[in-house]
Amino acid sequence: MLVDSFNRVIDYIRVSVTKQCNFRCQYCMPATPLDFFDGEELLPLDNVLEFLKIAIDEGVKKIRITGGEPLLRKGLDEFIAKLHAYNKEVALVLSTNGFLLKKMAKDLKNAGLSRVNVSLDSLKSDRVLKISQKDALKNALEGIEESLKVGLKLKLNTVVMKSVNDDEILELLEYAKNRRIQIRYIEFMENTHAKSLVKGLKEEEILDLIAQKYKIMGMEKPKQGSSKIYTLENGYQFGIIAPHSDDFCQSCNRIRLASDGKICPCLYYQDAIDAKEAIMNKDTKNIKRLLKQSVINKPEKNMWNDKNSETPTRAFYYTGG
């Protein structure tokens, strides 16, 4: 079992399989050239697999595959199948922008993936183009429908931005509700790679907009996880991830492995442990040691709710958000 200095059990790893992305979203990497990462040094997926087997043996019960855009990584379905075969009790989920999802959904489902989280920031084509610098809405929606068709569980993630997509909060909720998908609204998390003009809506502002149409009956906070779950009068549930107001760090159960082999204890802080050599050598003893050290290094909490704190400098496309 992996336990940090604050007695939190760490049983969830987010694994970035690439920094590359086919989008250039305003809140993540808007100014990065599309070919910027052509020469990136990636950990071979077989080596990542061995690392994750060790992590599973140490008590990890959930693995999320991220990027960049993870569906750009070749051989991903085979990697997931091998991971699933090693321990079928481990939940395997994936975060994607959905652009390549339609053609890959069936293979991902057959490989053993249990759920997909799709970023959907707008239902308007021109707005998606403005946000992501990609004419991507049609592909994303088709990917969502195909995932439902093949039986993949789904969640939608929406980063809510002032004067960008805040007028679509209800429309996006209706879209998700009609498909029995949970949508999670995410407060914009300031970082030095985002456009400086991007401003997010806070949790209470999002709730006020939803309350204009729906009666919110209650809220529950899962013991683990970063989102609060709200229930509407009709029984539909949606989530809000609010790092500026919610101290979800007290129940944090995760660490992150970047595509270059660094283990990141926290999304906010720059600190990381370089495990590349151990992973490349499949050095079980050292991997265990570095894994445990990264857990011990986890800070008590992030600082997004501190107005005097510095803006995080490590890119979300590096750690996988």
Swiss-Prot record:
Family from the record: Belongs to the radical SAM superfamily. MoaA family.
Binding residues annotated for [4Fe-4S] cluster 2, in chain numbering: C249, C252, C266
Function: Catalyzes the cyclization of GTP to (8S)-3',8-cyclo-7,8-dihydroguanosine 5'-triphosphate.
Pathway: Cofactor biosynthesis; molybdopterin biosynthesis
Reactions catalysed, as given in the entry: GTP + AH2 + S-adenosyl-L-methionine = (8S)-3',8-cyclo-7,8-dihydroguanosine 5'-triphosphate + 5'-deoxyadenosine + L-methionine + A + H(+)
Keywords tagged on the record: 4Fe-4S, GTP-binding, Iron, Iron-sulfur, Lyase, Metal-binding, Molybdenum cofactor biosynthesis, Nucleotide-binding, S-adenosyl-L-methionine
Cofactor remark from the record: Binds 2 [4Fe-4S] clusters. Binds 1 [4Fe-4S] cluster coordinated with 3 cysteines and an exchangeable S-adenosyl-L-methionine and 1 [4Fe-4S] cluster coordinated with 3 cysteines and the GTP-derived substrate.
Alphabetized GO MF terms: 4 iron, 4 sulfur cluster binding; cyclic pyranopterin monophosphate synthase activity; GTP 3',8'-cyclase activity; GTP binding; metal ion binding; S-adenosyl-L-methionine binding
Sites where the protein binds [4Fe-4S] cluster 1: C21, C25, C28
Name the UniProt record assigns to this protein: GTP 3',8-cyclase
Binding site for GTP: R14, R64, S95, K155, R254, I255, R256
Domain Radical SAM core: 5-233
Entry-linked SMART domains: Elp3 (SM00729)
